[in-house]
Design a protein with these regions (language model features):
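Canonical P-loop GTPase G-domain recognition
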Residues: 121, 130-153
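Short, glycine/charged-enriched secondary-structure capping and boundary segments
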Residues: 24-26, 78-79, 109-112, 138-141
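Residue-level signal for inorganic ion chemistry
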Residues: 47, 115, 127
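Short, well-ordered coil/turn elements that cap or connect secondary structure elements
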Residues: 25, 58, 117, 148-150
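Histidine-anchored nucleotide/phosphate-binding helix
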Residues: 107-121
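N-terminal accessory targeting/assembly segments
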Residues: 1-105
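Short, glycine/serine-rich, charged loops/turns that create anion-binding
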Residues: 101, 129-130
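Structural beta-sheet core signal
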Residues: 96, 124-126
């Protein structure tokens, strides 16, 4: 049986198994090659471009290489104090959402710091405006958020 190697993009993570969409549109459930996760613990995240190897006899393709990233959204790994955790890669814009009736300004600040560190364009979207008591209330919240983040709300 022949093995095929292709380039694709991670579009979903499901219980640690990336779903990779190939350039021809086909999707493959994958696992990471042992060589990737030993030592440096490089794991593909949503948005990563990866090289996969697959054979018809296997139920999962194998991610053999994570291609260089243009951007990363990184946070401290909650399980290990010193190790950063990459959440997403290779994006142009980050959209931070908060419900307009319950904006948590401290959380929004933390999310915006992480987002701005990537160098990507950042937007804030306030959701659930229909649950507010009045349009004036929504406008007051929008102004508070705009004072924090700028005009793109």
């Amino acid at each position: 049986m022949e093995e095929t190697v292709a380039i694709g993009c991670v579009v979903k993570l499901d219980r640690g198994f990336p779903l990779v969409r190939l350039e021809d549109g086909a999707e493959l459930r994958c696992k990471h090659a042992t060589s990737l996760v030993k030592g440096e613990r490089v794991r593909a995240v949503i948005g990563d471009r990866v090289r996969v190897s697959f054979a018809e006899r296997n139920d999962k393709a194998l991610i053999v290489e994570v291609l260089p990233r243009t951007r990363e959204l990184v946070r401290k790994d909650p399980t290990e104090r010193a190790v950063p955790q990459v959440l997403a890669a290779n994006f142009d814009r980050i959209i931070v959402t908060q419900p307009s009736v319950e904006v948590n300004m401290r959380r929004l600040e933390r999310e915006l710091v992480l987002a701005h560190e990537t160098g990507a364009a950042v937007s804030v979207v306030l959701t659930k405006a229909d649950l507010a008591e009045s349009e004036d209330e929504v406008e007051r919240v929008r102004e508070r958020v705009r004072a924090l983040v700028g005009a793109d709300v």
